[in-house]
Each structure stands twice: as structure tokens, then as C-alpha cells.
Amino acid sequence: SLDPKTRNGTGRNARIEFKGVPILYTPWISFPLGPQRKSGFLFPDIGLSSRNGAELTVPYYWNIAPNMDFTFAPAVYAKRGLDLSGEFRFMSTRQEALVDFNFLPRDRLTDSDRGRIYVEQRYQLPSRWQFTANATHVSDGQYYEDFAAGAENTSIPFAERFAELSY
């Protein structure tokens, strides 16, 4: 049902079919009827890799405020265990910030805690000056090899860090 007053829609027993075959089903779904953001679960991600085995990620999006949100995306890797992942975003008239992290306590394959954190910050300073800083830290040199989302990230020899002041 669609409710223009609350600008929300809901569905029961919703499914998506391809050539008459159901490929996605949900017993209940709620969604906004416009560009506004809404807290809730996002579509899960299912995968399979030789390094990690079967993978399942179930992200939850939290709309904290109009200028701030957080996505928590725990993932289960059959060969490695539970990975706690999140992304926090903040924006104001003079500032943007992003914190993206993963933490895998006690990786079953390496018997060690593993993780990554990436922080990005932009400040608009007075007189058209701008300060930008990015920093990445990984737990070990093999991290990107084991958890990179794409082939372009698997051969990164170092974690990037930089700061820049520009006019």
C-alpha cells in the first residue's frame, strides 16, 4: 500500500520474478515514496570465494539525522568467521567526514584479529582555503589480498595517508 500522507509504502509477500521464476521474496517491505532517506535493512549480499568460502552480509542503514548516517554491515565468512563492518558519514556546510571500517576478531585462517579503517575529512576554511586529509590503516600486509572488493585493490603495497591544504 502507498500512503502519500506519510510518504511511505509497504508491501506484503512481495517478490521479483524473472521469466515467471521468483528470484527475490520478502514477507514484508517498507520504503519511502520520495527522495527522503529511511532507516532499515538493505538487501543482503551473498557470495562465494575460494579465500573466504560462502559469504553473507546483512547491512542495516541508520538515518541518524539529515546530515549524518551510519551503515552497519556484519558479514559472515564460512572460512574466517564474523566480520563487523560499518560506514559513518557526516556533512555540514563547511565539513564532510567519512569513517569506514572492518574488524574480524580472531580470523579462523590466521588465528589473529584483522581489520581496516579508512578516515576521510574535508574542511572548508575561511578565505576559500580547504583542508583535506585521508588515512588508511590495515592490520597486516595480507589484508587487501584476502578482503579486497575488486582486483584493483589486491596489490596495494601500503595504506594511503595524506593531508593537503589548498586555496
PLM segments and residue spans:
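Outer-membrane beta-barrel initiation region
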Residues: 1-93, 98, 151-155, 159-167
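Flexible loop and strand-edge segments within Gram-negative outer membrane beta-barrel domains
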Residues: 100-167
